[in-house]
C-alpha cells in the first residue's frame, strides 16, 4: 500500500532518505514528485487559541488563505509550505488572532535539503520562545541568523578576550556603554557618524569613547586581524546582557 505524502515528508524531515534520488523515487506518484515550494513555515502552538465561538480551526484558516500549503503537525508544531512571495504577509494577522509565533524558513532549493533547513528553523523558533525575546510574532530565519549563532555559543566565556570581559564589568558597574559603542563601531566599518546614529549620540562622544577604548581599556582597534575576535566577543557579552532583541534584523533593512 503506497504511503501518504505526509509520511514521505516526515521521513525526509527525520533524515530518513540516503540521497535525493532515493527521496524522488519514493515520492513518485505523490504531489511531491513535482513540488517546488519557495519556503516553509513553522507555527508554534504553545499559546494557540481560537478567539471566537464558531471560528474555523487554524488548519482550515491556513488552507483557505494559503492554497497548496499542505499543513500538518510535526513534532508539536504546524509545518506548511509557502509558494508565493506574499504568502508570508498573511501570517501577521493570523499570529495576532490566534496568538501564534511563526518562523519562515530560508528558501528551499531542493526538498531533499529539508532536514538542514528544518533544523535551523526549529532552533530559530525555539529562540522566539525564549523569555528574553520580544521581537515580532512572525520572523524569518534570515532575520535570526546572528542571535541564533550567539544562542548556540551562549555560556562560552572562554571565547571572550580578557580585555573585553574587563570592559563588560566596567559597563555593568558604572552604567556606561563601551561594549555597545565597540559593537557598533566595528559593524559600522569604523564610521563615527554611523556609530553615533546607532547609539543616538554625537560623533564627538563616540570619538571620546573610542579613544578611551584604545588608551584606557587597551582594546586593539589598530589590529585588523583581531577585529573578528573582538566582534564575536563583544557580541557574546551583549547577547548575555541584552538578549536576542539587540541583534534582530528587520526585513526593510535587508539588501
Where are these regions (language model features)?
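Cytosolic nucleotide-utilizing catalytic cores of signal-transduction proteins
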Residues: 7-255
Amino acid at each position: 500500500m503506497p504511503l501518504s505524502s505526509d509520511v514521505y515528508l516526515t521521513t525526509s524531515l527525520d533524515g530518513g532518505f540516503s540521497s535525493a534520488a532515493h527521496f524522488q523515487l519514493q515520492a513518485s506518484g505523490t504531489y511531491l514528485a513535482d513540488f517546488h515550494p519557495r519556503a516553509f513555515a513553522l507555527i508554534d502552538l504553545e499559546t494557540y487559541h481560537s478567539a471566537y465561538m464558531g471560528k474555523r480551526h487554524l488548519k482550515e484558516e491556513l488552507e483557505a488563505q494559503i492554497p497548496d500549503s499542505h499543513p500538518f503537525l510535526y513534532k508539536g508544531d504546524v509545518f506548511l509550505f509557502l509558494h508565493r512571495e506574499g504568502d508570508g504577509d498573511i501570517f501577521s494577522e493570523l499570529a495576532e488572532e490566534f496568538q501564534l509565533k511563526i518562523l519562515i524558513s530560508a528558501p528551499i532549493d531542493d526538498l531533499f535539503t529539508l532536514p538542514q533547513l528544518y533544523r535551523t528553523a526549529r532552533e530559530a523558533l525555539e529562540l522566539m520562545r525564549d523569555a528574553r525575546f520580544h521581537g515580532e510574532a512572525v520572523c524569518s530565519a534570515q532575520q535570526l541568523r546572528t542571535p541564533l549563532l550567539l544562542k548556540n555559543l551562549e555560556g562560552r566565556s572562554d571565547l571572550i578576550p580578557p580585555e573585553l570581559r574587563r570592559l563588560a564589568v566596567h559597563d555593568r558597574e558604572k552604567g556606561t556603554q563601551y561594549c555597545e559603542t565597540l559593537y557598533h563601531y566595528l559593524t559600522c566599518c569604523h564610521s563615527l557618524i554611523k556609530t553615533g546614529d546607532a547609539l543616538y549620540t554625537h560623533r564627538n562622544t563616540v570619538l571620546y569613547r573610542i579613544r578611551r577604548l584604545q588608551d584606557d581599556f587597551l582594546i586593539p582597534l589598530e589590529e585588523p586581524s583581531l577585529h573578528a575576535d573582538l566582534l564575536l566577543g563583544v557580541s557574546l557579552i551583549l547577547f548575555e546582557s541584552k538578549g536576542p532583541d539587540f541583534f534582530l534584523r528587520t526585513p526593510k533593512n535587508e539588501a
